[in-house]
């Protein structure tokens, strides 16, 4: 029987060849991927809702605080509030991915799931922790979700700054 060049190289180095484990049937894989896509959709929708709510809160605060604090301190606090709200939102989103990776059995602990989710969600991609072979595509799903939410956050923060610059108190 002919061996592939990759198999020969793996045996020569003494590495184990990673293959899909038999207990991960196609139906199980499809369910996990469907759950990941649902989670990505949920996180994106939640993110949009939080942005709308945060915008309302920040503009109400701006209108309320302008008389008490003055224009410049109020605007600085609005920007700080926007950045803080976005930061907490992204932390919560990474925690949702971490819980998914941990509870679905893809990570040994929540801490490992948290680290992997943070690295994937921010598209940092160190690669020091990876998912087993049949599940590797879950990382890019998390990364795409992170790109979309971080893009929305960037646009939101720019919009807040634009409102402050174009409509001074």
Predicted regions and their residues:
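Single-residue recognition of alpha-helix boundary sites
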Residues: 58, 104, 136-139
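Hydrophobic positions within alpha-helical membrane elements
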Residues: 52, 95-98, 130, 151
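Outer-pore turret/helix-boundary of cation channels
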Residues: 89-116
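Generic detection of intrinsically disordered/low-complexity segments and helix-coil linkers/edges
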Residues: 27, 108-110, 120
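Generic alpha-helical scaffold signal
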Residues: 48, 74, 78, 90-94, ...
């Amino acid at each position: 029987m002919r061996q592939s060049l990759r198999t020969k190289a793996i045996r020569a180095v003494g590495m184990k060849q990673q293959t899909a484990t038999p207990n991960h049937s196609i139906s199980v894989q499809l369910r996990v991927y469907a759950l990941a896509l649902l989670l990505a959709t949920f996180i994106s929708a939640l993110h949009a809702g939080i942005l709308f709510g945060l915008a309302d809160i920040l503009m109400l605060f701006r209108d309320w605080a302008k008389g008490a604090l003055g224009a410049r301190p109020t605007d600085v606090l609005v920007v700080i509030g926007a950045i803080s709200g976005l930061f907490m939102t992204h932390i919560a989103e990474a925690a949702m991915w971490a819980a998914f990776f941990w509870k679905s059995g893809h990570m040994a602990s929540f801490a490992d799931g948290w680290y992997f989710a943070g690295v994937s969600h921010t598209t940092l991609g160190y690669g020091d922790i990876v998912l087993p072979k049949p599940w590797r595509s879950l990382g890019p799903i998390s990364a795409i979700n992170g790109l979309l939410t971080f893009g929305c956050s960037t646009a939101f923060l720019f919009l807040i700054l634009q409102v402050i610059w174009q409509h001074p108190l």
